C-alpha cells in the first residue's frame, strides 16, 4: 500500500461565513495549496475545527474538497472522536467520499487505558479500508499512545504512520527502532520540524503552510537534498511565524493570518474566539516582514 503520509501536509483551516461553511473561500484556500505543490492536505483536523462541525457539514466539507482537488494531491480527513461509534461513522463517510486516508487521535477527555486506545483504533481499522495515520496530541486529548501501543497498532495493515505534536525528540528514534520499515513518523510541531526529521521523521503536518506553503515546501526540499544550511536558513526565517501562530489557541492565529491575507473571513466557532488585538498586530508584522502574499 502506498504511504501517502510523508512530506509537507497542510493542516488546513476551515473557512466559515455567517456560521456556515464558506465554500468559495474553501476553493481559494485549496487552490493556493495546489499551486504550491504541497504533498497532501488534512481536512477537518484540529486546525480545521473538525470538532465544531455537524455531521452534515463534515460530509459537505469533504465532498467539496474532493471535487475541487480532483485527485491532484491526496486528501486526509480528520476522524477523531471520544465516541468510538461516531469515529467509525466519520471514517465510513470518508471512505464513501473517497478521500485518500484519515487521521485520528486517542479519544479525548474520557482517558482510556492503552488497551482502550488499541481497541478504539482496531475498531476503526476493521470498519474501513483507508490508510490511517495516528495522531499524538496529548495536550489536546489528555492521553497519548505508549511506544508499545504504537508498535501494536503498526502491525495492523492500514495503520501506516504517526503524527507527533510533542517535543520529545527521542521519540522518533525510539519508534523507528521498533516498527516496520515502511511506518512513517511526521512532526505536527512546526518549531521542531528539522530536529524531528533529523531524528527519523519523514515529514511535517504544518499549520504555517496554510499561508506560507512555498517556504515550508522549500524548507523540506532543501532538507531532503541534504542542504542542511539552506533548510536551517528558511527555518530561522519562519521561526517568528511559528511562534506567532501559537500565541493563542490554534487555530485562532492562523485563521486571522489567512483573513489578513484575503483567503477567508476571520470567523471562528465558539468556544474559540477571534485573536486579540495584540496577537493580530504581531501576526501582521511578521507577515509583512516575511513578505508573505497570496
Curated annotation (Swiss-Prot):
The keyword Acetylation does not apply. It catalyses: L-aspartate 4-semialdehyde + pyruvate = (2S,4S)-4-hydroxy-2,3,4,5-tetrahydrodipicolinate + H2O + H(+). The record marks 46, 109 as: Part of a proton relay during catalysis. Pyruvate binds at residues 47, 205. The keyword Transport does not apply. GO terms for cellular component: cytoplasm. One of its GO terms (biological process) is lysine biosynthetic process via diaminopimelate. CDD domains: DHDPS (cd00950). It comes from the Bacteria. InterPro entries: Aldolase_TIM, DapA, DapA-like, Schiff_base-form_aldolases_AS, Schiff_base-form_aldolases_CS. Keywords: Amino-acid biosynthesis, Cytoplasm, Diaminopimelate biosynthesis, Lyase, Lysine biosynthesis, Schiff base. It is an enzyme of class 4 (lyase). Pfam families: DHDPS. Its main location: cytoplasm. It is found in: Cytoplasm. Pathway: Amino-acid biosynthesis; L-lysine biosynthesis via DAP pathway; (S)-tetrahydrodipicolinate from L-aspartate: step 3/4. The active site is at residues 135, 163. PROSITE patterns: DHDPS_1, DHDPS_2. GO terms for molecular function: (R,S)-4-hydroxy-2-oxoglutarate aldolase activity; 4-hydroxy-tetrahydrodipicolinate synthase activity. Its EC number is 4.3.3.7. Belongs to the DapA family. Catalyzes the condensation of (S)-aspartate-beta-semialdehyde [(S)-ASA] and pyruvate to 4-hydroxy-tetrahydrodipicolinate (HTPA). NCBIfam families: dapA (TIGR00674). Homotetramer; dimer of dimers. This is 4-hydroxy-tetrahydrodipicolinate synthase. It comes from Rickettsia akari (strain Hartford). The lineage of its organism: Bacteria, Pseudomonadati, Pseudomonadota, Alphaproteobacteria, Rickettsiales. The gene is dapA.
